[in-house]
Structures are given as C-alpha cells and as structure tokens.
C-alpha cells in the first residue's frame, strides 16, 4: 500500500483480467518516431474538461476501459497520482504539456503552456520530491534542457549537456536523476560517417547516440559514452530512406532511448534501431554484453525476444524490464526478463498485455511500483495500465487522443505559490462559487465567507472538495465573498477574495 498524501474518495474495484503468457512472433518494421506538429485547425478535438474558474485549462478526459468504469488505477494506488505529458495536437489531443491526474483521472496539476513535454515525472533530488520534464525543439529527437521544479512548482534547476556537445543539446528520451544527485541524459549530435554498409554514401552523416551523466548542482559532465566508438552502423535494423544520410537529413542508425544505472559500475543503454540493450562499464565505456540485436550475447527463451524497444531498466530483484514495441504481431507489451550471465540466456518472466490488441509503434515505458505492481505507459497509444507483478491487469485508462512519451505513478504533495482561483456567478439573490487550486493536493474542503465587507464576513457554506473544480451554492452572497481552502484538520491553507 502506498502512503496516503491527500484525502481521496474510494471508487469501485477494477476487475482482474488474467494476462496469459503467450509466445512472441515478429511483426512488421516500425518507422522512426516523429513528434507531429499541428497541420489543420479542422482536427476534431478529443473530450476535454472545462472549468469556470480556469477557462484556460483544458486537460483531457480520462476514461477507464476496465470492467468497472470510473476507476483509472487499482485500489492500492488510491493515494498516488499519474504523471503524463499529452502531446501531438494534430491527433486531436485536448492539450499539450505537463499533466498530473489522480487515481480516478481527475486533474491535480495542469500546465498547458508547453509546446510538448517529454518524460514528465516525480523524482527525488537532494532528498526532496521534485518534478522533472524535458523542454525544447523535437522531431524524432530533440535539442533542449531538463527542467526541475520543487513542490511549489518553482523551477529550482535546469540541467543540460556539456563538454564537446555544448549546452542545450539534451535529447528528450532520458532525464533520470540518480541517488548521487546526477542526471542521465541522451543527445543526438550530427556526425560524419561511412554509410556504405547500409547502402548510403561513404561520406555521409548520422545521428550518433551520446549518453552523459551530469552533476545537477554544478553542470559538470562526469561520464560520457558515444555510440560510434562501440556500435557499428551496420548493426542497425532501420532502413536508410531515400534522401537520408546527408547533413540536412542525418541517418538515425541507433536511436538511443533510455539510460539507467545497473549497479555501481555499469549503465544500461537501450537503442531502438539496433533492437539492443547494452550493458556499459562506467570506467571504460566498454560494452560488457548485448541483449538482442545482430550480436546478442544472450540466447532467448520462448517469448523473450523483443524489437524496437524502449525503457530498459534493471529492477531490485535482478530482472530487466522494458517496453517491447513489437511484441506479438498485433500488440506491444511490457516485458520482464531474467538474465542468466552464467549460461547467457534470457528467459521470459512475465509479459504485460493490454485488454485488447494495442500496437504502439513508438515510445512507451514500464515502471515497477513500490508495492510490486507494474505501470505500463503505452507511448504512441493514449493509454496507461496497472498490473500485478504476475501480469494480471488491474486497471486500464485512456486519454483518447495524442500520446504521452512515458507514464508514471507516484505519490505527490504540491503546495502552489499562486492562490486559488474563484469565480462567482450570481442568479437573482443567490449564486454559485466555482473554485479550484491548480496543483494543490492537501485541500479537503472549501469554505465560503460573505458579507458587506471583510470585517463582517461570515461563513456561508462549507463543502468537500469535489475534483479539480468545486461548485459551491451560496444562498445570499454579499458584495464581499472570500473562499478558504481547508485541509483535513480544518486548517486554512490559503484564501482568495472573489473579484
């Protein structure tokens, strides 16, 4: 059971759907990921929420697809939140930017000012919870920085690349903070290379995959790994398209999409376009083994092979998790493997399948939660799901359109510096106050005070918080109306005078 951080009502129990362990079969080759840009104002918008107190915010409606409609996370996750980065306006998604929703899909914090967010999540930095996300210019790769926010949603750090790469060259695929106060970053510099092994020009251009470990406090680069020193271009499975391989259109032979710690001495690097997870020695950068691809160090057992994968992570029990974009022919999956380095075999432990076929050509992640459950974000497909460790589907939810590079679950406590927002709509002698507080997680109820002025204002109504925005009927609102946010103990957290 995760720790409770905010009063949230209970909902219906999601039906358990058993996920069968089936074999793997290869599917068609997927294209390189591209983040679309808006192309038409005539795109039909997906369902969005609208608020009287915050008309500028239009987060997507989260809909449960599991049997007991209304539940977006399993009961054990009632007090945790989901972190999403909806994007791709040309698909009709309701907003782009950072989005936190609760276990039922109700908005907690909405930042719709972004042009597209990647890898938005809760992490720990210097012993405190923070929010992190990548911001910059992107297509299938990006140039930008990683933003770090504290619990008041104030920027406390900006992390970027260094060394020969220079600043602002961080790609959007990885933003992990380590326990040592460093961040693991990826970058895609354009480099001259011989592409004759792929049918391209001898004097061509590629996107090299670079991993950096950067000290957040100082910006110092502590470790760097460059793919062309270790992975030949001929290892790619990505076809060279006509016109690719030039400086204007370099060939993405590797497509590095995750970097994670593998004990104190190694890193795991996932490369989509070589179908490989590499274990890399921190000291030398040497590849100690390869999982998958043309030169796999491991033999795969039934159902264990993968392709075009994302988000490879070593778990506390020694297993390796990843998002297999090309699992069975019609569906992607979350994957958990056991690696035996004495026999060099990779064995399927469990796979996490959607309730119906769901092929995510790009993006996606697998997160093992503290209670052992598993969260799967479906990348290009606008869904997220929670499973038991053994593969039983507990909940599945959709935000209808667009995509979210990854999806995460974590407890979060937010205390915004900005005050609540409130609007009074009068109807004759009565009225209704609409109030919200974007990002505040400790509000249990709202109290309305009214009178001729502040000196004689008296309580007129107290109601429980009812989602992101609460509507409060007031029988006889005076010329002065104040709304107070109360925590579970009845303490006033903040107040706002309705204009």
Set out the residue ranges of the language-model regions.
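Histidine-/acidic-rich catalytic cores in large beta-rich domains
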Residues: 30, 34-499
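Secretory targeting and sorting signals
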Residues: 2-29
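Intrinsic disorder/low-complexity segments
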Residues: 1-3, 37-38
